[in-house]
Amino acid sequence: DGVAVKQRDEAEYRKMAESKPEWKKYSDALDSLNQYIKNNSDKEYRYAMGVEYFFYGPEFFKMIKASSELFNGWNTGVSAEVFSAEKNKLISSARAFIKKYNEGVDQSIFNALTLQYQGSEISANPNWSLINVAALSGDIYGKSIFTDSTRFIQFVTSYTNKSSKRLTNDPAFVFYNSYYPIFVQEVDKAFRQYQAKITPLMQRYVEGKYTMFPNDKH
């Protein structure tokens, strides 16, 4: 049992740390580490759920990310040559991507993971309670340019500054850009702060293992 082994190892660690005054810092670090992890378990959980959803979830998320340079490039005034090259690269990538894309499978993944992610986030972000996943899924896979090869390639091929208005009505684009920024600006940021606090405590704890148990395999 992993929990029992952890408890046994930590009890042995504390007992050894109490044997010398100069080692007390190691048991203090262990206590602080465990307490901090307990108090901030939500940060690790929300981060893990967000990574699974936004980086390993439905394929249309990847299409939106891949398109961002093209859409942002137009708005930032890149040269016509650069813009055209970016457009052609995106069309080429889309055609390669389409060969292995299965809309039905992707929609099933979206439905399952969105329900799961909604359940994990709803207490932190009440806006999730407003989302009907089945209805949203129908809109995204029935209307979005990012879930249909023909719609996507036609859109990119004829993309101009006026095309950006269509994006504001695209259900996949609107959904992704409503919730992914929250993950980046809130969840990811909080997790990195959590890690920054954990790191020195973990380093002190590991230092204690090497100092107090030099003959053990670490």
Language model segments and positions:
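Terminal presequence/propeptide segments associated with secretion/organelle targeting
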Residues: 1-218
